[in-house]
Each structure stands twice: as structure tokens, then as C-alpha cells.
A protein has these predicted regions:
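Pyridoxal 5′-phosphate
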Residues: 1-413
Length: 413
């Protein structure tokens, strides 16, 4: 199924060079970048180089030798998010970042039966489950914000739900199970207009690396990110933005000696976001993360976003022509995450057929986002997530396999 020739890539990126930089392109058609992206070779080379240094001179000594470069990783991440490196804390995943923020808020608050926490209806399970625990044990009220007519979080509905009992607002920028983009900056402005004291947590694990994200403009107190998805860093890495308000009012719990000093009279904490970090890290992974971020910065986030928007838009157009396929993505603007299902063929069967053809995609099921799946009557879906190194030909091959696998079933339906 060929691409409409009216659709053109205006990113200006050298796709041949991008593929040469990405060794995995020679092995697979990787369309699972919302799961874990193929890294550019510079990421792997950077990690291996540091591991070899640890092998030869010892871990502490290798850390000391690479100290200057390690310290610049936060600055690179700050540049990616249009903020200062002093507002960046390193972690092991987006969930690790999010949990550190959430526990700090709980540690500073007197949560009880009157406490309300508002969450987007498309929120990911790992962000909802801790709130459900507070609800079970402390009586905290978890409420989901309705979607608007386009299928994204309704800012007006959120404003009507705000009162002094709202302790936190939890929003994902781009959910894992749909191509929608939530209006996180508009929500931040709404909270400011209402002069709400609620803490604003944004899960940006699927947006950073594929969309330009200005953490300050979003207005979040915390913005959590993983390294392994669209940033194209190694697994076991993550980071978060911490606002000046968060740094002035919140302490991590439990404290760690990386960001906290034990003094004769008690303890003191760092004034920057490193107070939220743990002392122990894989510095090879940290350096790999830095290499991935620098690679993205060198390409330019506008160019990356344009390329991904082109590919995902083309894919949606092609899938929409396959009989029986429903493209599920909502919202006016859409991310690089493309989701669909078929009227008679299970998503898992389509994913298996694609895997057999050497194409990596994911299957989505309700346990990852119960409210969203139930509200939209979806029992399972196929998620396809291209990145800059993918080609139109790979997308055409993907759609061809989907069409072949579902064709006979559609004829019998």
C-alpha cells in the first residue's frame, strides 16, 4: 500500500546517515520506539568505553576520570528541556523519577479522607497504583478528569474540579496506548490562574525525545522522563525536571547521601535537583544517556518532531485504507504513537505476524490504563511507533503484513 505522494518529509534530516548511525537497522524493522528505541551507535560505544575503563582501573577511579563529562549530562538534559541543569535529577526510569516526586509530596503533606488527587483518564498504571494505595490505606480520593470532545484531557473540566482539597494533579503528556497529546501547558496555566496549591506532575516519558518540550512553559512541578524510549538512551536510565517551587518546599524521602549530608547537628540537603538522586548509578549508562541527548540536540528537536510526525501521519493514512482496521488515536494534534485494532483479528495475532516478518511493534491491553481502555471500548490494540531512522518503505511493509493477516479474516467476517 503506497504512500500518498502529496505527503512529504520536510525535516531536512539525512535518513541514510541516521540509519548508518543505527546499527540495528541492518537487523530489524524496529517500529517499537515507544517501548525501547534503537540507540545510535555513539550511545553503545560511549557505554562500552566507560565499562572498559572500569575494567582496567576500577569503578571509582573511572568515575573520577570521567567526572567532568558526567557532570555535563544534566546540562545536556537541561538544554533538551529548555531549562537549567540544576533543575535536572538523574534516575533509573521515568517511574523511578515519578515515584521520588510523589513520595516527596506525600512526605510533606497530611493526606486524609478529604484529600483529592486528580488524574488524566489516560494515565499509566504505574502512576495510578500508588494513588490507589493511598486511597485504600488513607482514604485519599482518586478522581479522573474527563476528556473533551477531541479525546484529550478537558482543561475546563479540570478547572471546575479544583478546590483546596486537591493535593496533586497527574497528567501524562503522551500516553503509551494512544497517539493523543494532552495539553500539558494549558493545564499548567489553568492551575496558575486558579492559584491552586496542588502539585503538578507530568509524565513525559513518551513525549521527550519526539516532541519539543519546554519544562518551564509546561508549568509542572515535576516532569518525569525515561531514557530508553524516544530519547534513544540505554535502559535503566531516566531523569526528571524539578521546579523551583519543588526544590524550595520538598525533600526526597528517604534521603540519600548523594543529595544529603549528615552533619553533627542533623543533615543538610543540596539546593539543586540532585537532592532527588541516589548515590549509586551505572555511570556507563549515565554517559550513554548523555550521548543520546547530545545526538538529539545535534539533530534538533524541531527536525526530529517533523520527521516523526510525517512518518506517523503517513502510517495512519495507510492503515485507514485497510478493511476492518480502526485507527484509535485521538486529539487534534497527534504524537508518533500510532494505535489500531481490527474488527475480527486479535491484536496479539497481528503483532505475531509482524514479528514473524521481522517487524517490531507492541500489543496494548487494559491493565496498563484501565480507565482509558474501558471508556473507549478497547480490549486490545497494536501500537506502532516510528522514529527518525525508519523509512516509508518499512511502514508500507508493515501495512502490507497487517493487510495480508487481516484480509482473509475480513472476507469471512
Amino acid at each position: 500500500m503506497a504512500l500518498d505522494t502529496h505527503q512529504q518529509d520536510k525535516s531536512g534530516l539525512d535518513v541514510a546517515q541516521l540509519r548508518a548511525d543505527t546499527l540495528g537497522c541492518t537487523e530489524v524493522m524496529h517500529l517499537n520506539n515507544a517501548g525501547s528505541a534503537l540507540p545510535p551507535s555513539v550511545v553503545v560505544d560511549t557505554m562500552v568505553k566507560h565499562l572498559r575503563l572500569e575494567e582496567m582501573i576500577g569503578g571509582y577511579e573511572a568515575h573520577a576520570r570521567a567526572g567532568d563529562r558526567i557532570n555535563t549530562v544534566r546540562d545536556s538534559i537541561g538544554a533538551l528541556l529548555d531549562t537549567s541543569g540544576s533543575n535536572i535529577a538523574l534516575s533509573t526510569s521515568a517511574t523511578d523519577s515519578w515515584d521520588r516526586a510523589f513520595v516527596a509530596i506525600k512526605f510533606a503533606s497530611d493526606y486524609g479522607p478529604d484529600t483529592r488527587i486528580l488524574a488524566s483518564s489516560s494515565e499509566y498504571a504505574s502512576n495510578v497504583l500508588p494513588v490507589m494505595q493511598l486511597s485504600r490505606h488513607l482514604g485519599v480520593q482518586l478522581e479522573f478528569i474527563p476528556d473533551d470532545e477531541t479525546g484529550v484531557t478537558d482543561v475546563g473540566a479540570l478547572e471546575s474540579m479544583l478546590d483546596d482539597n486537591v493535593a496533586a494533579v497527574l497528567i501524562n503528556h503522551c500516553p503509551s496506548q494512544n497517539g493523543l497529546i494532552n495539553p500539558v501547558a494549558a493545564i499548567g496555566h489553568a492551575l496558575a490562574r486558579a492559584q491552586s496549591n496542588a502539585w503538578y506532575l507530568v509524565d513525559a516519558c513518551q513525549s521527550v525525545g519526539q516532541l519539543p518540550v519546554d519544562a518551564v512553559a509546561v508549568g509542572a512541578d515535576f516532569l518525569s522522563v525515561t531514557g530508553r524510549k524516544f530519547v534513544r538512551g540505554p535502559r535503566g536510565t531516566g531523569f526528571m525536571y524539578c521546579s523551583p517551587r519543588a526544590l524550595s518546599e520538598l525533600e526526597p524521602f528517604p534521603a540519600d547521601l548523594h543529595g544529603t549530608t549528615w552533619t553533627p547537628d542533623g543533615y543538610t540537603m543540596r539546593s539543586d535537583a540532585q537532592r532527588f538522586e541516589a548515590w549509586e548509578k551505572s555511570y556507563a549508562a549515565v554517559l550513554g544517556l548523555g550521548a543520546a541527548v547530545d545526538y538529539a540536540l545535534n539533530l534538533g528537536m524541531d527536525a526530529i518532531s517533523t520527521r516523526i510526525e510525517f512518518l506517523s501521519g503517513a502510517l495512519r493514512s495507510m492503515l485507514a485504507e485497510v478493511p476492518g482496521v480502526a485507527v484509535l488515536d485521538r486529539g487534534v494534534d497527534k504524537s508518533g504513537i500510532v494505535t489500531f485494532n481490527h474488527e475480527s483479528v486479535e491484536a496479539a495475532e497481528i503483532v505475531a505476524a509482524l514479528k514473524n516478518a521481522g517487524i517490531n511493534v507492541s500489543v496494548g491491553t487494559p491493565e496498563y490504563s484501565q480507565v482509558d481502555y474501558i471508556a473507549h471500548g478497547v480490549s486490545s490494540l497494536v501500537r506502532v511507533s516510528p522514529h527518525v531512522f525508519n523509512t516509508v518503505e518499512e511502514l508500507e511493509r508493515c501495512v502490507e503484513i497487517v493487510s495480508d493477516r487481516t484480509g482473509s479474516a475480513t472476507a469471512q467476517y
